[in-house]
Amino acid sequence: MTAPLHAGLEVCARRLTPESPAPIAIAFSGGGDSLGVLLVAKAWAAACGRPLVALHVDHGLQARSSDWAIQAQAMAARLDVPCQILRWEGDKPTSGLPAAARAARHLLLAQAAREAGAQVLLVGHTLDDQLENAVMRGAGAPVGPLREWSPSPVWPQGRGLYLCRPLLTVRRADLRAWLVAEGLDWIDDPANDDIRYARSRARLSLDGAAPLAPSPDIRALAAACKATPWGGFEIGRAALLAAPPPEALRLLQAALACASGAPALARPARARDLV
């Protein structure tokens, strides 16, 4: 068994219930990451008999997007997984397009997953996505770390729906190597390499980089942060002052977001006002 498949199955074994009759939904763009998570889901479901449904969002932002939707549906069919195509209709914004597309995608996926009776949506984020988020946070973007298990970010359409990321510890290169070994092709969206977008620039800056382990200062800072019964946070002053300033600032951003219930990290300037 390959390392990506083993890692994904281990997460599924911990997070998913084999006995449930509800289908497992998979966000399936047809790209390499989502194809990897579809293979993991297929292997896990084969052992317990749970039904699967793939959901493909056609954003309509590329000239070939309709062709990609049909291609993704055919890819899923070859794995005996039904695939529903969802389309982002209406006018598209001229600014803030990535954020608007992401919000529309989450909304469409949540609606379709719940209509299918699914309570879990598998998403193909990898360790590279986690690293890209860290680079973007360092540049001031209000993006938090990805979680293996988290509630749908849309409300009320995503009520009762959870996102599971089985490949969050897997490097994208290792995942692609597995797909190549299986003789599988995937869709490459040129937008992933468009440096007009912050994530593409972060991806380019990380090309070939190894993941960094948390430093002792970061681990001490995490240990010094405790949630209170009333919904706030207590952060040890000594650990906060001893931590590298960028990491201390990001902890304050996250604490503000959690305590306030905001959907994204607080802006750096707001967090700096606390210190």
Which residues make up each language-model segment?
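Short, structured loop/turn "capping" segments at alpha-beta junctions
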Residues: 185-188, 212-217
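AMP-forming adenylation/ATP pyrophosphatase catalytic core
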Residues: 5-30, 53, 88-90, 153-160, ...
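Core alpha/beta nucleotide-donor-binding catalytic domains of modification enzymes
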Residues: 1-205
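Extended, highly charged alpha-helical segments
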Residues: 201-215
